[in-house]
């Protein structure tokens, strides 16, 4: 039964009341009928809104687990997410046995060379033109502060094929010592990490290097503290 039919029935019932109910008792009856009509309309309206906005009604269907029921587009998205990338990438780590220098190694745990990146003369050679994320981190460690001011530098440089000149892409300087350790005072250890990272347009054949000025302060106590890498975007 529709809402209009229910309202019409109530109106007919009200019209069918004997005319003698015009007194106080008849007024109460008409008032109750009007109240009942209002509640009926309000309830029907509420039910319609709940059904319309999906608050009540049939539950949503779960995503089918059977591959045959999955749309071709969804299958294509899933398969593409599993396709290995063919973009150049490199991640090299420092050689802890190289004294007095920062030497990069690619044949170590957690190191990686893929899709054309080659190490040459402690540098990474870019295999193809494009945008690259270049990054590097070093960790310095010392004991106490000497009389001469300690300045720690870390630099990522580029030698482009178009102009054979070394150009700094990223650079940072830190000083672990604000003042000299007084004579006789305890020489406390200090640590200074430097991280560099940025996105650059590179050409095929460009050579990239990550260097420091004081390799004797490098800390190799833990793996993953000193590294250098590039990722094609």
Curated annotation (Swiss-Prot):
Residues marked Cleavage (site): 39-40, 49-52, 76-77
Q: Which residues lie on this side of the membrane: Cytoplasmic?
A: 1-34
Q: Where primarily located?
A: membrane
Phosphoserine modification sites are 2
* Xref: CDD domains: TNF (cd00184)
Gene Ontology annotations of biological process type: extrinsic apoptotic signaling pathway via death domain receptors; immune response; necroptotic signaling pathway; negative regulation of protein-containing complex disassembly; positive regulation of apoptotic process; positive regulation of canonical NF-kappaB signal transduction; positive regulation of extrinsic apoptotic signaling pathway; positive regulation of JUN kinase activity
Q: Name one GO cellular component term.
A: plasma membrane
Give GO MF terms, alphabetically.
cytokine activity; tumor necrosis factor receptor binding
Task: Name the InterPro entries for this protein.
Answer: TNF (IPR006053), TNF_alpha (IPR002959), TNF_CS (IPR021184), TNF_dom (IPR006052), Tumour_necrosis_fac-like_dom (IPR008983)
What does the PTM comment of the record read?
The soluble form derives from the membrane form by proteolytic processing. The membrane-bound form is further proteolytically processed by SPPL2A or SPPL2B through regulated intramembrane proteolysis producing TNF intracellular domains (ICD1 and ICD2) released in the cytosol and TNF C-domain 1 and C-domain 2 secreted into the extracellular space.
Q: Tell me what topology the record assigns in the membrane.
A: Single-pass type II membrane protein
- Does the entry feature the keyword Nucleus, yes or no? no
Q: List the disulfide bonds.
A: 145-177
Q: Determine the domain of life of the protein's source.
A: Eukaryota
- THD domain: which residues? 88-233
Compartments where located = Cell membrane
Point out the glycosylated residues in this chain.
80
Transmembrane regions: 35-57
Lipidated residues (N6-myristoyl lysine): 20
Keywords assigned = Cell membrane, Cytokine, Disulfide bond, Glycoprotein, Lipoprotein, Membrane, Myristate, Phosphoprotein, Secreted, Signal-anchor, Transmembrane, Transmembrane helix
Secretion signal, residue range per the UniProt entry = none
The segments annotated as topological domain Extracellular are 58-233
Q: How does it assemble?
A: Homotrimer. Interacts with SPPL2B.
Q: What family, per the record?
A: Belongs to the tumor necrosis factor family.
Function (record text): Cytokine that binds to TNFRSF1A/TNFR1 and TNFRSF1B/TNFBR. It is mainly secreted by macrophages and can induce cell death of certain tumor cell lines. It is potent pyrogen causing fever by direct action or by stimulation of interleukin-1 secretion and is implicated in the induction of cachexia, Under certain conditions it can stimulate cell proliferation and induce cell differentiation. Induces insulin resistance in adipocytes via inhibition of insulin-induced IRS1 tyrosine phosphorylation and insulin-induced glucose uptake. The TNF intracellular domain (ICD) form induces IL12 production in dendritic cells.
**By what name is this protein known?**
Tumor necrosis factor
Gene name tied to this protein: TNF
